[in-house]
C-alpha cells in the first residue's frame, strides 16, 4: 500500500526541533489511536460528550470544570469571548456588538508575541481589545494594575518560551492583581507540562495544547472556574462553531491526558543522557561547537545548542538541512547569534 509521503508527493521530515506546530507537533500512542478509532466508529450526543469528558478531566486535574476545544488558540479566542459575554446568548450570537463595551484584555507587553499568529489576533477573534501593560523588557504587578479600568474584561498571561522571561511578574502575582480588582485571569500555558500549578496559583481559566506536552491529537483544553467554563462552552453557539472539535479527537485527547498523568513526560536528566552522544559527535567536527542547554523558559527540558563558526552561517546551515530529503528541522530562534 502506498504511504502518504508517496501518495501526496511529500518530503519526509526528521524532527530535530521539538513539538512544533509546523511539523505536526507530536506522535500519539496506540491507546490514543484506539480511542480516536472508537470515536470515529460510533455516534454520541455531542453536547453530552463535551460535558462528560470535561467533567472527567476536571476531576483528574482537580479543577472545577474543563472544556475540550480544537486548539490552544481556539481556547484563547473562546475564553476571551466567554469573559466578555458572561453567559449572554445575545452576545454569543452578536460577539462584536457595540452594546458591550467591557472588552479590554490587559496583557503584559512582553507577552504580546507571534507564536505562529500574534496573540492579539486570537484576542480580537474573541472580540477583545488588547491593552498592553508595562514595557517590552519588564512588567510588574503595578504595571498591570494601572491598566485596569471599568472596561477591563480580563487579564491574559502567556506562559511560553516565546515571551520575554526577565523582569516579568509571575502568574501568582498576576492572580493577586486580578483578585484584588475582581477581574478574571486567563493563563495560556499551551506547551506547559504541569497541568495543576496555574490553577493552584490562582488563574481562573488555564489553556493547554493537546498535542504538545500531552502528546495527544489536535486539541486544546480550557480548565478553571465552573461558571467561566459554562460561558466557554456557550461559545459553541457563537465563534466556537468555526472551531469545533470532532468526537474522535475528544476521546483521543482524553485518553492522552490519562496517559500523561499516569506516566508523565521524559525527565530532564533522561534528556541530558540522550543528548550526550550527539553533543560529543558534533564536537568532533570542525567549525561546530555543541553543548547541552536548558529551556529558556525554565522548564525541565534540555536541548543541544550548536554554535556555527565556519564558512557558512547558522542560517545557511539550517536552510541546507531543510533542503535535503529527508528534511531536517532544527530550532531557529538563535540563528542570528550563530546558534542552532
Per-region residue spans from a language model:
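Conserved PLP-enzyme active-site core in the AAT-like
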Residues: 2-23, 27-28, 54-261, 279-283
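Conserved C-terminal alpha-helix-loop-beta "cap" of PLP-dependent enzymes
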Residues: 4, 287-340
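A structural motif shared across PLP-dependent enzymes of the aminotransferase-like
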Residues: 21-32, 43-51
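Short coil/turn segments at secondary-structure boundaries
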Residues: 48-49, 245, 333-334
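Generic alpha-helical secondary structure
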Residues: 50, 271, 275, 310-318
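Conserved PLP-dependent catalytic core of the aminotransferase class-I/II
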Residues: 261-294
Amino acid at each position: 500500500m502506498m504511504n502518504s509521503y508517496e501518495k501526496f508527493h511529500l518530503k519526509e521530515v526528521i524532527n530535530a526541533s521539538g513539538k512544533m506546530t509546523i511539523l505536526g507537533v507530536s506522535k500519539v500512542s496506540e491507546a490514543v489511536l484506539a480511542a480516536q478509532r472508537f470515536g470515529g466508529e460510533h455516534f454520541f450526543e455531542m453536547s453530552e460528550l463535551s460535558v462528560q469528558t470535561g467533567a472527567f478531566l476536571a476531576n483528574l486535574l482537580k479543577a472545577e470544570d474543563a472544556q475540550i476545544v480544537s486548539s490552544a488558540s481556539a481556547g484563547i479566542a473562546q475564553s476571551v469571548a466567554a469573559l466578555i459575554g458572561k453567559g449572554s446568548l445575545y452576545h454569543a450570537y452578536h460577539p462584536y456588538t457595540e452594546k458591550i463595551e467591557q472588552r479590554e484584555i490587559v496583557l503584559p507587553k512582553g507577552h504580546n508575541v507571534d507564536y505562529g499568529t500574534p496573540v492579539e489576533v486570537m484576542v480580537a477573534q474573541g472580540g477583545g481589545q488588547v491593552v498592553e501593560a508595562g514595557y517590552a523588557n519588564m512588567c510588574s504587578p503595578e504595571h498591570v494594575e494601572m491598566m485596569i479600568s471599568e472596561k477591563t474584561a480580563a487579564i491574559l498571561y502567556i506562559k511560553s518560551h516565546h515571551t520575554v522571561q526577565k523582569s516579568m511578574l509571575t502568574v501568582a502575582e498576576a492572580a493577586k492583581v486580578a483578585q484584588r480588582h475582581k477581574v478574571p485571569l486567563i493563563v495560556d500555558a499551551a506547551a506547559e507540562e504541569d497541568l495543576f500549578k496555574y490553577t493552584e496559583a490562582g488563574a481562573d481559566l488555564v489553556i493547554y495544547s493537546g498535542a504538545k506536552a500531552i502528546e495527544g491529537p489536535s486539541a486544546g483544553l480550557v480548565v478553571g472556574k465552573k461558571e467561566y467554563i459554562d460561558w466557554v462552552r456557550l461559545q459553541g453557539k457563537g465563534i466556537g462553531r468555526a472551531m469545533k472539535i470532532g468526537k474522535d479527537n475528544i476521546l483521543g485527547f482524553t485518553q492522552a491526558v490519562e496517559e500523561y498523568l499516569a506516566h508523565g513526560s521524559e525527565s530532564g536528566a533522561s534528556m541530558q543522557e540522550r543528548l550526550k552522544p550527539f553533543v560529543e559527535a558534533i564536537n568532533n567536527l570542525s567549525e561546530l561547537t555543541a553543548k547541552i542547554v536548558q529551556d529558556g523558559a525554565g522548564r525541565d527540558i534540555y536541548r543541544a545548542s550548536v554554535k556555527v563558526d565556519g564558512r557558512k552561517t547558522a542560517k545557511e546551515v539550517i536552510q541546507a538541512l531543510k533542503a535535503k530529503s529527508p528534511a531536517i528541522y532544527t530550532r531557529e530562534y538563535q540563528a542570528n547569534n550563530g546558534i542552532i
